[in-house]
Amino acid sequence: AIRGLTDRPRSAISGNSSYTAARIGDVYGVEAGVLLPSVVSDEFPTEAGLDESSETHDIAEPYAVSVGRAGWVKGTWETVSMLAGSGISLAHVGGGAGEDLARLTQHAESCGVGLWVAPRLSSPEMAALIRGARAVVSMAHGEPFGLTPVEAISVGTPALMVDEGGFRDTVIDDVNGRLLPRDDLGAWHSALEQAADGRTRTAWAESGRARIAEMDLSPDAHCRRLESVLDCL
């Protein structure tokens, strides 16, 4: 389908990150530009809003948050395995098939990791959950862009991401979060300890917000970039 599009006159192919654009080139042999996604920033405000609930969820603290439907591609089982022995529980947001969630619960129990599977959350509820977390973590495979670190950084919670995929566009290692080797569990545990330090959290949040502002993921900027692509056709 992509090769067919490139054969059409006045056509352009874009990926939502430098990783996605590179993968399009590797797989299809066609040149692709980068068209960053848009993010509505006020859904994850810097300061807690009045609509954010202070309700304590049924999960032992400290906890980390992972986002995405439970499955291999999101690295959900790997995340639980990584947390074993860390003393950190996991709040899983994104649901999944009933059978998969049952297996995930059994896996967490076998690893001694506390697990809370979140119900459907509103944006304020999601922001509150992330704000109270030690970190937001992801071991996703081939994540095209990854909005999760943007959401975490916006509310001031450390983003600990696997050093792969589109996460490299938003996270600069040890500047505004961490990019970590998938198989180095010691590095992940050290990063989770690092994320507990108040000064580190503040420094990463400030650098992260500056990075997001530099990328300008606003809907208006997205429209301007899309218009620029169309103007070049």
Where are the regions that the model predicts?
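Membrane-proximal helix-turn-helix segments that form the acceptor-binding/catalytic region
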Residues: 1-13, 20-22
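A conserved mid-protein helix/loop that constitutes part of the nucleotide-sugar donor-binding site
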Residues: 62, 69-85, 99-100
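Glycosyltransferase donor-sugar binding loop
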Residues: 67, 88-104, 119
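Nucleotide-activated donor-binding/catalytic signature segment of Leloir-type glycosyltransferases, i.e.
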Residues: 102-124
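Aromatic "clamp/platform" in nucleotide-sugar-dependent glycosyltransferases that forms part
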Residues: 141
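Short hydrophobic beta-strand element within catalytic cores of glycosyltransferases
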Residues: 158-162
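Conserved acidic donor-binding segment of nucleotide-sugar-dependent glycosyltransferases
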Residues: 173-174, 178-186, 193-199
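A charged, aromatic-enriched C-terminal amphipathic alpha-helix characteristic of glycosyltransferases
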Residues: 187, 199-230
